């Protein structure tokens, strides 16, 4: 899976703030089962990948998984024990900005109990409270 954008217009971004709920990406589009965020957070590319791997390992063949979020925000960090000033730190990792209501993963092609189990394992990898939802 692609863990960061191929190219961006600017190397560094402001942190911004997460207010309100997600109006886009809050409906199931591709699969039958989904994992929905209940809290706002930054989810790193590593966390997204860990969740995807956990789900894939759990459903094995048969199931199809869609990742509905993409880490497109660079997070900068200053080197440790560095004095303040002399500009902004260098980009260290990428995050996806997630608001409440956003669908993180979708799944289809498996029984509900298997999907519930796989999605709960993926949910434990996330830094936020989530819920399992079924389309229809």
Swiss-Prot record:
One GO process term, biological-process aspect: translation
Q: Does the keyword Phosphoprotein apply?
A: no
Q: Which GO terms describe its molecular function?
A: rRNA binding; structural constituent of ribosome
Q: Which SUPFAM superfamilies match?
A: Ribosomal protein L16p/L10e
Q: Where are the transmembrane segments?
A: none
- Highest taxon in the source lineage: Eukaryota
Q: Which GO terms describe its cellular component?
A: chloroplast; ribonucleoprotein complex; ribosome
Keywords in alphabetical order: Chloroplast, Plastid, Ribonucleoprotein, Ribosomal protein
InterPro entries per the UniProt record, alphabetical = Ribosomal_uL16 (IPR047873), Ribosomal_uL16_bact-type (IPR000114), Ribosomal_uL16_CS (IPR020798), Ribosomal_uL16_dom (IPR016180), Ribosomal_uL16_sf (IPR036920)
**Subcellular location field:** Plastid, Chloroplast
Family, according to the entry, reads as follows: Belongs to the universal ribosomal protein uL16 family.
Name the HAMAP family for this protein: Ribosomal_uL16 (MF_01342)
Q: How does it assemble?
A: Part of the 50S ribosomal subunit.
Protein name, as recorded:
Large ribosomal subunit protein uL16c
């Amino acid at each position: 899976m692609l863990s960061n954008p191929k190219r961006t217009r600017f190397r560094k971004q402001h942190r911004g703030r997460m207010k309100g709920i997600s109006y886009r990406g809050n409906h199931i589009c591709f699969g039958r089962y989904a994992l929905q965020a209940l809290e706002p957070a930054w989810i790193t590319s590593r966390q997204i990948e860990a969740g995807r791997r956990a789900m894939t390992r759990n459903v094995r063949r048969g199931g199809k998984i869609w990742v509905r979020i993409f880490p497109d925000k660079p997070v900068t960090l200053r080197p440790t024990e560095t004095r303040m000033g002399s500009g902004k730190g260098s980009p260290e990792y990428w995050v996806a900005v997630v608001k409440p209501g956003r669908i993180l993963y979708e799944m289809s092609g498996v029984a509900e109990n298997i999907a519930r189990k796989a999605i709960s394992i993926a949910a434990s990898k996330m830094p936020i409270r989530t819920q399992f939802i079924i389309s229809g």
